[in-house]
Curated annotation (Swiss-Prot):
It catalyses: D-glucose(out) = D-glucose(in). Binds to DAXX. Interacts via its N-terminus with SRFBP1. Interacts with NDUFA9. Interacts with TRARG1; the interaction is required for proper SLC2A4 recycling after insulin stimulation. Glycans are attached at N57. This is Solute carrier family 2, facilitated glucose transporter member 4. It is found in: Cell membrane; Endomembrane system; Cytoplasm, Perinuclear region. Expressed in skeletal and cardiac muscles. Expressed in brown and white adipose tissues. Residues 45-80, 132-141, 192-200, 308-322, 374-384, 438-444 are extracellular. The dileucine internalization motif is critical for intracellular sequestration. The gene is Slc2a4. The keyword Cell membrane applies. Insulin-regulated facilitative glucose transporter, which plays a key role in removal of glucose from circulation. Response to insulin is regulated by its intracellular localization: in the absence of insulin, it is efficiently retained intracellularly within storage compartments in muscle and fat cells. Upon insulin stimulation, translocates from these compartments to the cell surface where it transports glucose from the extracellular milieu into the cell. One of its GO terms (molecular function) is insulin-responsive D-glucose:proton symporter activity. It is linked to Defects in Slc2a4 may be the cause of certain post-receptor defects in non-insulin-dependent diabetes mellitus (NIDDM). PANTHER family: SOLUTE CARRIER FAMILY 2, SOLUTE CARRIER FAMILY 2, FACILITATED GLUCOSE TRANSPORTER MEMBER 4. It comes from Mus musculus (Mouse).
Length: 509
């Protein structure tokens, strides 16, 4: 089998690894600008919560007229705020179903370009909401930016995974998550009262998401389309060859094109799949279950509960400056994503995911103990900060970055878009459930709420240990072929997953 455009043959017979070209860097950077916006809009709603609620109150009172109540009912305000947070996920849930259709119709690059229409509209609506005295406009803007993020969550990993060299696919795939966490951190810093988190400037804070959208619109036209899409899906050999030359920096891409031809021949029996075809396929049942459970492990870990409500969590823990503690969590978030970038090709996807889940489970238990003892032991406020920081750090080691790009690795070209849609919908559905329901569950369970996440994390750890294979260093064709040789998840005996069991020996061994 040709070693692929990830490794291009040399005269001495030893296939050198593809170098990192300027075009590859530009393409990855331009793509992950979408992920930056995704993260920004996760974090931007947190710090200015109080001033936005004051705006909601003023808007509501203005509609009541003279002789009305003095303030908005607390239940109404809680519902409006929860809706403002969770509607973002509703937009993502709906648009994630369109990932496969749009990516096949427009191509990966043009789909990302067209998606920016939603970002510009959503940002503009959120920026104008206060001037229009309408929380409905803000909620609509959050819905549109959520729809943008839903498409981004599938399009970016798909594009980056298809243009990345095999030996860098994990590291470059992790940059998607790095951009998300940088976006969260930027939003948290700009949301401080000393920055844009004020009663007059918060609309600008929400509208700033337009800037990376405009930058992406400028840069993406200079980037190549995915050569896998061009050749395997569109059968355009000339444009695919040109794209390969730009990405690899090699004048002769015959070996690279040979791999695509070989993959295309094998996929002639595996045409692009619809959602219904994928869901009914026995061949793809096992990787689909793994993909969905990995997405659930990310969202039901409790991480978005921490990000959405981190300020209020730190307040309940007795932290004097909760907004700054939240930013500290954002810094930890970013630093440990960088750690994951460095480790993912050395330690492997499965190992990092297991480590992250185990660490998060321990931190969730520690957080529960700290919150329970807070009234009797004031120093527990510092323990709670350490627990949250540890929770975030372990998330970014594994459950944060791994699920997004491993879906693209588990599937061949035919079912990949539909699989990304299923995985994306699963992720966004859980995001919505956590965003809408966490505050109510936290009110009911108090400090014990993170024990619920600890139990879920333990379950995901067991599943990953038993069923998730290692994909490091494998081509897409090798991974999909291994699943075709392996019995369905429902038919296997329960035993630990190993790289050798699923993927066979390393071709270099």
């Amino acid at each position: 089998m040709p070693s692929g455009f990830q490794q291009i043959g040399s005269d001495d017979g030893e296939p050198p690894r593809q170098r990192v070209t300027g075009t590859l860097v530009l393409a990855v950077f331009s793509a992950v600008l979408g992920s930056l916006q995704f993260g920004y809009n996760i974090g931007v709603i947190n710090a200015p919560q109080k001033v936005i609620e004051q705006s909601y109150n003023a808007t509501w009172l203005g509609r009541q007229g003279p002789g009305g109540p003095d303030s908005i009912p607390q239940g109404t305000l809680t519902t409006l705020w929860a809706l403002s947070v969770a509607i973002f996920s509703v937009g993502g849930m709906i648009s994630s179903f369109l990932i496969g259709i749009i990516s096949q119709w427009l191509g990966r690059k043009r789909a990302m370009l067209a998606n920016n229409v939603l970002a510009v509209l959503g940002g503009a609506l959120m920026g104008l909401a206060n001037a229009a005295a309408s929380y409905e406009i803000l909620i609509l803007g959050r819905f549109l930016i959520g729809a943008y993020s839903g498409l981004t969550s599938g399009l970016v990993p798909m594009y980056v995974g298809e243009i990345a060299p095999t030996h860098l696919r994990g590291a470059l795939g992790t940059l998607n998550q790095l951009a998300i966490v940088i976006g969260i951190l930027v939003a948290q810093v700009l949301g401080l009262e000393s920055m844009l988190g004020t009663a007059t400037l918060w609309p600008l804070l929400l509208a700033l998401t337009v800037l990376p959208a405009l930058l992406q619109l400028i840069l993406l036209p200079f980037c190549p389309e995915s050569p896998r899409y061009l050749y395997i899906i569109r059968n355009l050999e000339g444009p695919a060859r040109k794209s390969l030359k730009r990405l690899t920096g090699w004048a002769d891409v015959s070996d690279a094109l040979a791999e695509l031809k070989d993959e295309k021949r094998k996929l002639e029996r595996e045409r692009p799949m619809s959602l219904l075809q994928l869901l009914g396929s026995r061949t793809h049942r096992q990787p689909l279950i793994i993909a969905v459970v990995l997405q659930l492990s990310q969202q039901l870990s409790g991480i978005n509960a921490v990000f959405y409500y981190s300020t209020s969590i730190f307040e309940s823990a007795g932290v004097g400056q909760p907004a700054y503690a939240t930013i500290g969590a954002g810094v930890v978030n970013t630093v440990f994503t960088l750690v994951s970038v460095l480790l993912v090709e050395r330690a492997g996807r499965r190992t990092l995911h297991l480590l992250g889940l185990a660490g998060m489970c321990g931190c969730a238990i520690l957080m529960t103990v700290a919150l329970l003892l807070l009234e009797r032991v004031p120093a527990m406020s510092y323990v709670s900060i350490v627990a949250i920081f540890g929770f975030v750090a372990f998330f970014e080691i594994g459950p944060g970055p791994i699920p997004w790009f491993i879906v693209a690795e588990l599937f061949s070209q035919g079912p990949r878009p539909a699989a990304m849609a299923v995985a994306g919908f699963s992720n966004w559905t859980c995001n919505f459930i956590v965003g809408m329901g966490f505050q109510y569950v936290a009110d009911a369970m108090g400090p014990y709420v993170f024990l619920l996440f600890a139990v879920l994390l333990l379950g995901f750890f067991i599943f990953t240990f038993l069923k998730v294979p290692e994909t490091r260093g494998r081509t897409f064709d090798q991974i999909s072929a291994a699943f075709r040789r392996t019995p369905s998840l429902l038919e296997q005996e329960v035993k630990p997953s190993t790289e050798l069991e699923y993927l066979g020996p390393d071709e270099n061994d």
